[in-house]
Curated annotation (Swiss-Prot):
Gene3D superfamilies: 4.10.410.60. Keywords: Ribonucleoprotein, Ribosomal protein. GO terms for molecular function: structural constituent of ribosome. Belongs to the bacterial ribosomal protein bL35 family. It comes from the Bacteria. One of its GO terms (cellular component) is cytosolic large ribosomal subunit. GO terms for biological process: translation. Disulfide bonds: none annotated. SUPFAM superfamilies: L35p-like (SSF143034). This is Large ribosomal subunit protein bL35.
Amino acid sequence: MPKMKTNRAAAKRFKVTGSGRIRRSKGGLNHCMQEKSKKRLRRLRKNDMVDSAMEKRVKLLLPYG
């Protein structure tokens, strides 16, 4: 049986934590920053967890994660 391929796009966007949850970064920090409030930009810098509904799909993309 050949090895399963990791989806490289997903590998760059998601990290699996020690407990098996999946960490992701928030979008909206690349351009048009002047229009966004400082509070909003500060909140967007924090990482977030993938919700349980999407976790199963992301794990299929990261077979060795």
